[in-house]
Every structure is written in C-alpha cells, then in structure tokens.
Amino acid sequence: MPLTEFCYIPSVATDAFYTPEEQAIHNRLVKLYTLRMREKDGQNRKWRVSSINRVIKKHKDELVELLRKSLEDNITRELNPDAVTDKTIINLFCSELTRSLGIKTFERSDKIIIVNVFFFEVLNSIIHNGFNYNGEHYIFYSCGAGMIRTKRFMAVREKDYLAVEQTLMCGLTIDSINALGGMNENKLLSYKSLMASATDRIEDFDIDRCIVVDDFEMPVMAESDFIDYTDYSITRKTSETIIAETDGWGMCCKPGFKTQIVRAPWIKGLVSYFDFRGWLKEYCPADDWTVIDIYGKEWKILEDDIQYILTKSMFKLHKFYPSWLCYKSNFKSYGCYFGCCKVEEDYIPKARINYQMLQSLSDMTDNEIERLIAKTADEIDSIGRDYQTTMRLLGATEYNQTKSAMQEALTIYPELFKDVYNRELLKQTKKSLVKQAKGGRLRINGKYLFISPDPVAFCEWLFKGEQFPTGILENGEVYTNQFKDGDELDCLRSPHLYQEHAVRINKRNELTDK
C-alpha cells in the first residue's frame, strides 16, 4: 500500500553547491552564528551581539554578491560529495517516478536528489544549468505545491530522466506544450509532480476500457456571502451559482472496485464505484447507451466495454492532445500506468475533530463544550482500565491489517499489556492524547470519508440529456452507509476553510444502498 514502501535518497541544501570562495564565507558565517548563540546563552551583552550582527551582515552581503556574480557567469555548479552523508539521506515514498527510474523498494539511490533552497541565486542556476555530482549531470525535475511551500525541489540524473521522459509525460515534451500555447509554470510543475505522488500501481487497469467526458455543471440557488472588495463588507444573498458537480471525480463499474484516489500522467482525482452499466440497462433504452467524449468521439458503453468514465476536470492537459485515442496510444506505447494513492477501506475508524472546525463554532455554551469533550475525557480516563480502549490504543485490533509482533502477541494474550514496554507505551499515549485534546483534537462520533456527487444525477445528465436531473438525493440530503437513515450529519471539509457547517440528513434505503 502507499506510504508503506519507500527508497532512500540524498537531501541537501543550497550551501552544498557553493564554489570554494562562497564556501569560505559560508564557513565564517557558521562560526559567527555559533558565537552569537553562545553570547546570547551566556552574558548576553547587547553591544557584543550587535557587533557580531554587523559582521554577519557584512559577510552575508559578500556572499550574495558572489552568488550574483556566479549567476551572471552562467556557471554549472558542482554538488560537494562531502555534503552527502548518512545524516542527509531521507525516505522517499515509492511512486511512478521511482518505479520508472528503476529504483527498487528500500534501495539507496542517487538518481533523485532533493534540494532545500536558502539562496535563490543557486536555485536559478540549477533550474537553467543543472548541476554535476560524481561525474553525472543532474537537471531540475519539478516541485509540487507542498515543496514550493517548504522551498524544496526535486532534481533527477539527466541520463535516467531522458530514458523515461516520454513515460512520465505520456508523449508530451516542454516544446510541444509551448507550441500549443504553453501553460502556467506552477500548474505544469504540480502536474509533473503527480508522478512523484506515493502510489501503488493499478496493475489490472485497462486504458482501452476508459473514456473522458465533460463535467456536469448545474445552476444552484443558495445563500452565498458576497465580499465587496472596496470596503470588504460581507453581504449574504440568495442567488444562482454555477456549481461543477463532478469536479475531479469519475466512476467505475468494475465488480470489486473500491473508491480510491488515482494518479496517472496529467490525470488526478477520485474514482467511485457505481454500476452505470447496470443502471443503463435498467433505466435507459438502448438508444441512450452512447456518450460523447471531450473530443467529440462517440462511444458505445456496452459494445466498447467501457468500465471507467473520467471527467474533463480530472484530465489536466487535455487540450494538448488532439484526441483521447492519441492519449491512449501514447499511454500504451510508453508504458504508462495508473496509480492509487488511497483506497476507501471496508472498516473506517472514528475520527477526531480539529481546532479549525471548533473555532468556527463561535457561540458554543459551556454545557455544549462539556458534551463535546466527554468522549475524549472518558477515553483518557479509561486507559489501562478498559480492555477495548487499551487494546485499541495499542493497535491490537481485528481491523489492524499491519500488526507488529507485539500487537499480534497482545491479540493472543491480552494480559501482556501489563508488560513494562506496553505500560510505558500507554503512559506516553495518554500524555499525547491529553496534549492533542488541549489542541482541539477531540474524539467524536464522526468519520473521514470521500465525498462524491450524486452518480444517478450525473448519469441522467450524461446519458438521458436531462439538464436538471433529480438524482436520488433531495436538497439537504446526503448518503453514507456509515450512519443510520435520518441521522443529522455535519459535513465538514478537511482542512476547514470557512465558517460553514453543512448540516445534512442521511438518506438510507434499499435504493441508495444499492
């Protein structure tokens, strides 16, 4: 499964690429930082700290000037081999990128190097000229949204990248993208990083059984907050808003398929299980068993044996391919794969709410707060006393599919929880739960679930051509088999981005369960 298999790669900072002159200044700066820290921890004389700061600023200015000169000289930097040590080796989860490059699970490899950016002059140089390490040339590969936030990027050994470039980009090149009008650089980097997402290959995925159709959009009449950007006043109005119901969502009718987040070259999103072929046979005449893809080609769902229907919003670079057939041809020719990031498991444990969601409940009373924290307080008090709570916190449960040897032993002989090791583990767990509770992570009767649009409404729009389909859910209703029919559910997005708490009624019956 994803996040269980990884490889080992170097992670270095931009100071590992300094020239000898730049390194000399850097070494002096390190000594000055140490001297300043000792002074602050010792006598903390302000005049001495100020004096050290002035010298630090002078050396920083000298270093920046040298970096700028090196950038103007357009040099190709060298990675200092001494900077790659056991301490700088990190874990990188296995992905389609690592598999394409031939990096084996738990293998130490130099084919990929992570660079932490502190000086943008070095970053600029590497982006344009790459760098050399142990006689090999490396080039800038990509950095996703998470890497941009933490000022990191991924570099790949050039000869290895060129061998798999067409596989990673499914036949496209930077030149071919620019020839068709180009695109936003940050978006391109994010989409290239899809291949570095921690995934497992979906070995039985057949691209010939897959199509891409337009997204289902529908006007919705609802209350919205309008912000006046002149004075930032907020006015709540009831108005009509166009909502992309199927944004980043697709469906699969393959028996045994589990709802999962998928990745492929230029494709990302959630694919849910829905037997649309069975629905077609039951609710539509044979004339409606056809669909038009985003390129205008007609597909016969049953005759063409279509099992996956993806939407346009999932296919990020669709405009750079002349047809879906072209993408499929490249996909097969260059040995591309679909990968799975996360699968919705059969057993879904209860979740903990977080401080963001609690902060948006600004009018809670003391009694409501006490009710909200009751389960967390009971859980903490019952550690070591209640059998089920103790076993659950130690991981010795039936639904834990990756038990350690100790957890297996606890399952056979529960009294082992009195062992010194387990008692210490429970003690640290209790401390952690208390700390989490103080930070707003409270145990509640809730679960983290994938959310998808009404697939029946989507099929009514896609196959029947209904512009305002009714589906099987009314306004204010949701469906999940994790709660009872009629339960009032607070549907919250994680991370929580706004004040709203979408309270909905769970609708469960024979039709929705089907």
Name the predicted role of every residue range.
Residues 1-514:
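Conserved small-residue
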